[in-house]
Amino acid sequence: MNPAIWRMGKISGAMTMPDCFRWRYGSKALEVLVAVICIVFLLPWMQMQFAGLATILRYIGWDISYTVGIGISAAIAYLYIAVAGIRAPAWISIMKDILMMAAIVSGGLVAIHNMPGGISGIFDMAIAHFPDKVVIDAEPITKNATFVFSTIIFQALGFCVTPLQYQFIFTAKSEDTIRRNQIIMPLYMFMYPFLIVAAYFVLVTVPNLNDPDSSFMALTAANLPEWTVGMVAAGGALTCILVIAVSALNLGGIFSRNIWGVFRSSVSQKQAVLVTNMTTGASLLISVVLAVMLPNLMLGVINIAYFWATQCFPMALATFFWRGATRTGVFAGLLTGVVAVVVLTETHVTFWGLNQGFVAMTLNALVMVAVCLCTNPDEATNETSNALFAYAAQEEPEAADL
């Protein structure tokens, strides 16, 4: 799907995720709905990074309070994006990835080395003391395996359509660059076995750990030299700052272009930049307040936010690959999914143990297809559809040169 996103961004000149769907369907209502979903996703996502950064600061010996640490982090993130913009974070992400990969692999190897019996010893102890955290019970299957596998599928689809994903794709130089990155992406899975081993090692060696989110830092602090702990902390801190910076910049652009701009008859470049900067700063401030004042409430909000963001997947799939998609159909489907998420999570209703977001997305897709089949694309939608599919049909060398 990533090359299709890049093609649409190239043709339409889109700068944000809602821009794509405004261009494709010419619907301001759809644009605003997608923008609201993006903002609801990005705010708790930023708050989660602040919480992670606060955990890192506790392990590097900074004698500052949780609140002060988060405030300093917000100031650094704002200065960072004000100076560097979006492309510099894309470059620095390479350094972040190298540091994080090295840290996770090192942590996993240390866990294997320090446990008698290595990997088998770690899992033998985990099964003996925490069997419920190692094995998924077969019965009742609707409350265990069905939920786990539907959640895996749902999250995998959601990763394709987050607003951050669109932002990173738009900054790529060409469609070939996107394809090369997709070839490399599976290599990131290399670190997960080491991360799992490290997590279970901490589970069996530090059973009374108060904050499970700090398990990896606890492992490195207890088993690695100080300079290595510093490297791990640097990788984690850089990751948090990078995500905060890109998220805030993305949120500012979405608000100024796809919400504030929609309700203004004319917007100058100077006004748009001012609103973007103000919104970026406000989003950092709101995330800091949420991280400090309402950390427990945000756990539920993060869940709903991800459920909402993933509701964009059926619409995106239809937008890029189905000529018969109509503005009425995709809007009806997306709205159905958003409402279904709220109803299912608030009432705690489940169907066969499936992930509630997955159920909502299924309803979303069914409504979208049904309405699209009952309606016809208008002339403007047909024009954008023809332009998109004509561009995709070009020969590879020509497409790469554009």
Spans of model-derived segments:
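Membrane-embedded helix-loop-helix hairpins and adjacent transmembrane boundary segments
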Residues: 1-402
